[in-house]
């Protein structure tokens, strides 16, 4: 891979950056903070839901770890169930859920902790095309309404163009270009970005 997931893990605190590398949250250097101190939410491609817990318990897990009292946990979980329209799934186990339902539970669990930043690692890859398109719109609308900063890793160009306010194109562990979707599409800085993002007319010249 080009390093997308590794970069996400560094931001989360699961891996350390190379010497000199820093992770900054809103002007605060969090490079030395442990993951539990960074207050990040994470949604993985595999969802990483706990099979021994029901939906309600999965959503409340991060709150329990943060030692919120029972009423706060119940209130926040209820809020998430309503927000994600999965109230009727509260007591189902994970193996009783469809792919789309698991995705909603994983997102609810990540948002429940009110993270400073939400990290999503190709969360829609395992879903069929129709469901993927629908959830893409739902996630975009939800995160914008909540005002949550999100970093969304994807290899799908159309997904990046549809969701991103700013896009980072990576190749071989390095950043090839950073910019708005429009800027990257119309003004690619090199051949790799042009090839990756859109259809191009390439003309050789002297």
What are these regions (language model features)?
Residues 12:
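Helix-to-loop junction immediately C-terminal to a conserved catalytic motif
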Residues 20-29:
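Conserved ABC transporter NBD signature motif
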Residues 15-17, 64:
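A position-specific signal in ABC ATPase nucleotide-binding domains
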Residues 5-8, 105:
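ABC ATPase nucleotide-binding domain helices that frame the ATP-binding cleft
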Residues 1-3:
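Walker A (P-loop) phosphate-binding loop of ABC-type ATPase nucleotide-binding domains
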Residues 46:
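Serine-hydrolase catalytic-loop signature spanning alpha/beta hydrolases and amidase-signature enzymes
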Residues 39-41, 49-206:
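ABC ATPase nucleotide-binding domains
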């Amino acid at each position: 891979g080009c390093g997308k997931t590794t970069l996400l893990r560094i931001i989360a605190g699961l891996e350390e950056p190379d010497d000199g590398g820093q992770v900054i949250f809103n002007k605060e250097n969090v490079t030395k903070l442990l993951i539990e101190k960074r207050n990040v939410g994470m949604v993985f491609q595999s969802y990483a839901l706990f099979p021994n817990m029901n939906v309600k318990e999965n959503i409340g897990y991060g709150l329990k770890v943060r030692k919120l009292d029972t009423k706060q946990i119940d209130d926040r979980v209820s809020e998430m169930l309503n927000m994600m329209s999965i109230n009727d799934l509260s007591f189902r186990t994970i193996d009783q859920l469809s792919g789309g339902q698991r995705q909603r539970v994983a997102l609810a669990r990540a948002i429940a902790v009110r993270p400073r930043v939400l990290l999503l690692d190709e969360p829609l890859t395992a879903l069929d095309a129709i469901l993927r398109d629908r959830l893409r719109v739902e996630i975009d609308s939800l995160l914008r309404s909540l005002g949550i900063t999100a970093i969304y890793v994807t290899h799908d160009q159309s997904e990046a163009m549809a969701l991103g306010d700013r896009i980072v194109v990576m190749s071989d562990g390095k950043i090839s270009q950073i910019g708005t979707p429009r800027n990257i599409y119309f003004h690619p800085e090199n051949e790799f970005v042009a090839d990756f993002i859109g259809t191009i007319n390439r003309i050789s010249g002297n």
